[in-house]
Each structure stands twice: as C-alpha cells, then as structure tokens.
C-alpha cells in the first residue's frame, strides 16, 4: 500500500510537470448577431474568440482536471441590440456530464438568461478577478462558469459543488452593487440572483440532493442495473414536489424541466404501467404546460 501511494505521488508530479492537467471547462461559444444590421460584424467574431479563450483558459478553482475530463459546455449569445458600445440580448447556457460505463452524456444545465447586457470595445481584454468586478461581461461569464462547475460536482458527490456556489455568491454580491441588470434579489424570479438562491436557499436547495441521487446513484447505476438505477431516479423526483410546495415559482423547477424532461421520457420508455403512472402523476401538476411531452410517458405504456 505504501509503495502504491508513493508511485501515485510520483505519477501526480509527472502529470504536473508534463502539463497534462488542464483547466476545467471545454466551452464552445457562439454569438449570433443576425438581428444587428449596419455594423461591422468583425467585433462579434473578436468577442466570440475572446469569450472562448476566457472560459477555457481560466483556472476556476483548485480541482485538477485531465484534458479529457474537462466539462463540456456551450454558451449561445443572441445579440438583439448594439449601439457601438453596449450589447444586449440573451444567453443560452448548456453543460453536460458523461454517464459512467457508457457513451451517453446527460444534460445538467440548459438555461436561458434573457437579460444579458454589457459593454465591449473590440479587442478589449477580458480580465479575470475573484476579488473585484472587472466588467459586467466577465461577471456574467464568471457566474455561469461557477454554476456549471457547482452542478457538475454536485452530480458526482453529495454537496460536492459547495466551493463553486460560494464563488458564484461572491460574484452576485459584487454585481448587485453595480446597478447592472440581472443581479438584484427579487427583481426577477429567473435572473442570476434567483438561480443562485434556488441552489443555496434552505427551502429549495434539496435540488442539490436530487442532482446527486439522479445522476450518481441513478443514471450511473442504470448501465449495470437498469431497474435499481431507475428506482433511485423515481425516488429522487419527490424533491421536485417538495420544492414546489414551498416555492412554486422557483427557477430550480424550470431548470430541471429544461434539462431533464425529454430524458425522463426515455428513462421510463420501458417501465411498467404502474411506474409510468406514478412518475406522470408526480410531474404533471408541476409542469401542466408540458402535457404533450409528459403524455409520451403514458403513450409508451399503451404501445408496449
């Protein structure tokens, strides 16, 4: 055992020296400026490159990632207005996580931020700082980088993402004093402050337990034992009802829906009628506008 531990330390040192360890994110960034006319589009290309490099070259924490372990994520900016200095629009943030012992990847975040506004000058450097708000753009990028990491770590170990929620909270605290849109508490139940609160407030942070049970004890287990893994997923969904009962407008509920609803249809496609009905009856009161998608759970049972 001692020899093995020494060899592990030597291996770790070799990884560090050879530069095998990498930053945490592998983020694909796209900027759509189709709504903007009469402007040199070069600035959007420059911005896209700058954000890509910022997201992928920043060290967001102290975790060590191998190059092939980087978290796959995407950021889609749709710019709806630009006055030469200030851009406004929305941002779709997505992240995925691999499922153990399979080639399947599962979505963790699929969230649309509809209140994105920032100033940017072409070739302006994006400067990272943990202790100050360099710009609203970098604050937005920092916030979502930390949330991507927080949810990813939560999905692998109970409350494993706490360090990144703390970092995201620091970003929100600094940004709230700036007067910029999208940060103020109670301003909007789907803004960045609300997103953070959904995962940290005592009344709704059960969503973090759901993340771990659903992914690590559910999906990861399904590859080897489908019935056992699915049973854990079914049990974990009860957290959604608990959140709904105390905070029916919590963004945690819509974030789970947007990331997981289609996946749940597939998970239960081969379930027995009783299990399908149980899941349907739990989810439908929470997501009544999603009846068409939810009905597919029951439709499969009639076609078996």
Model-derived regions: residue spans:
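Second-shell loop/turn segments in exported
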Residues: 34-41, 127-135, 245-246
């Amino acid at each position: 055992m001692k020899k093995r531990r020494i060899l592990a330390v030597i291996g770790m040192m070799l990884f560090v020296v050879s530069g095998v360890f990498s930053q945490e994110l592998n983020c694909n960034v796209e900027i759509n400026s189709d709504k903007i006319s009469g402007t040199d589009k070069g600035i959007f290309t420059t911005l896209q490159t700058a954000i890509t490099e910022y997201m992928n070259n920043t060290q967001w924490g102290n975790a060590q990632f191998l190059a092939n372990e980087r978290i796959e994520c995407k950021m889609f900016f749709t710019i709806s207005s630009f006055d030469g200095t200030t851009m406004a629009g929305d941002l779709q943030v997505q992240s995925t996580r691999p499922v153990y012992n399979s080639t399947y990847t599962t979505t963790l975040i699929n969230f649309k931020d509809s209140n994105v506004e920032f100033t940017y000058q072409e070739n302006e450097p994006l400067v990272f700082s943990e202790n100050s708000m360099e710009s609203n753009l970098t604050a937005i990028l920092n916030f979502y980088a930390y949330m991507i990491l927080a949810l990813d770590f939560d999905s692998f170990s109970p409350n494993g993402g706490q360090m990144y929620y703390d970092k995201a909270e620091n970003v929100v605290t600094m940004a709230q004093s700036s007067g910029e849109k999208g940060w103020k508490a109670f301003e909007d139940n789907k803004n960045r402050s609300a997103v953070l609160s959904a995962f940290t407030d005592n009344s709704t942070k059960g969503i973090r337990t759901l993340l771990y049970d659903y992914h690590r004890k559910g999906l990861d287990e399904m590859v080897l034992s489908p019935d056992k893994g699915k049973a854990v997923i079914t049990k974990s969904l009860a957290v959604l009802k608990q959140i709904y009962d105390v905070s029916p407008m919590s963004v945690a509920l819509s974030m789970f829906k947007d990331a997981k609803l289609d996946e749940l249809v597939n998970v239960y496609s081969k379930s027995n009628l009783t299990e399908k009905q149980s899941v349907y009856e739990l989810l439908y009161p929470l997501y009544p506008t999603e009846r068409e998608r939810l009905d597919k759970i029951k439709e499969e049972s009639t076609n078996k």
